[in-house]
Amino acid sequence: MINNTEIRQNWTVAEVDQLFEMPFMDLVFQAQTTHRANFPLNEVQVSTLLSIKTGACPEDCKYCPQSARYNTGLAKEQLIEVAKVVKAAKEAKATGSTRFCMGAAWKNPKQRDMPYLLDMIKEVRALGLESCMTLGMLDNNQAEQLSNAGLDYYNHNLDTSPEYYDKIITTRTYQDRLDTLENVRNSGMKVCSGGIVGLGEAGSDRSGLLVQLANLPQQPESVPINKLVKVKGTPLENADDLDDFTFIKTIAIARLLMPKSHVRLSAGRDDMNEQTQALCFMAGANSIFYGCKLLTTANPDENSDTRLFEKLGINKEAINFSPSEAEKKVDAAIVRFNEKDELFFDATSKA
């Protein structure tokens, strides 16, 4: 039995391969035991994810419909106004989200983007929501700017194992990703980092991904586990389906290796039935994205999730929020930013 409160950062792929070989029921039982030793019972953290700049990404991630290299029918969209971000954040809070995540399809943000991003962070924080961004690679200076503006979390996934990585992405290295995570951590922000399974990887690659995450100098506070969403036009549109039990085992092992991290049941939920999702929660998942879309891919709507939570007796993580003060700030912000046309620009243009 694994010590269910100890944090280890010296895991080996061989050890994790052995965990994948455990009987399913035994593994899930251990994962649930670990979860109960570290988190409140029957409580799930709820986040909302908004695409603040969609499409035309120069990267070649083979799973991604936002890459400019693939014909997926996705239209390029401008960086959206700060006021629209604030409006979406208010709606997210009203439906029970405690964290608001903003994603931009960039290899990395440019300095000209930063003032708009910093305003978004400040306005979301004024609502009493935790804030998170995923913008691509960050240098030290950019990480410091985001941190100083109050950004709570920064997401930058490792995607897969180091050994399989160049089969999926060639436009940035694995070390680039690790360097960004180091810059985020050094700035004082919390780290959100996970990966995708079902990319055609071997079992040892799933083990390798989890080992990389668990053995970081400090384990991520949030670990999203994504199941590939196959999108027509991407190189992985015809990838073989990943067995649901393998996916659930991946969740369980993430919980065992990172006992104090939130493990997020992320992309791919729209294709999962309620029973599969319930087993993921049993295996230690305690975070989801709420809302009918994750950037550009489908996600269960809020009503479906609410019904599932009621069936399972799951509660949403509470919001510590004083509405009167924040609501006034947000309402004023919407008026203020609507009056500033310069806060809307095409971040993908070369001008």
From Swiss-Prot:
Cofactor info, note text: Binds 1 [4Fe-4S] cluster. The cluster is coordinated with 3 cysteines and an exchangeable S-adenosyl-L-methionine.
Binding site for [4Fe-4S] cluster: 57, 61, 64
GO biological process terms, semicolon-separated: biotin biosynthetic process
Coiled-coil region(s): none
Keyword S-adenosyl-L-methionine applies: yes
Family, as annotated: Belongs to the radical SAM superfamily. Biotin synthase family.
Protein name: Biotin synthase
Keyword flag Iron-sulfur: yes
Pathway the protein takes part in: Cofactor biosynthesis; biotin biosynthesis; biotin from 7,8-diaminononanoate: step 2/2
EC number: 2.8.1.6
Reaction it catalyzes: (4R,5S)-dethiobiotin + (sulfur carrier)-SH + 2 reduced [2Fe-2S]-[ferredoxin] + 2 S-adenosyl-L-methionine = (sulfur carrier)-H + biotin + 2 5'-deoxyadenosine + 2 L-methionine + 2 oxidized [2Fe-2S]-[ferredoxin]
Protein role: Catalyzes the conversion of dethiobiotin (DTB) to biotin by the insertion of a sulfur atom into dethiobiotin via a radical-based mechanism.
Lineage: superkingdom: Bacteria
Enzyme class at the top of the EC tree: transferase
Sequence ranges assigned to domain Radical SAM core in this UniProt record: 42-269
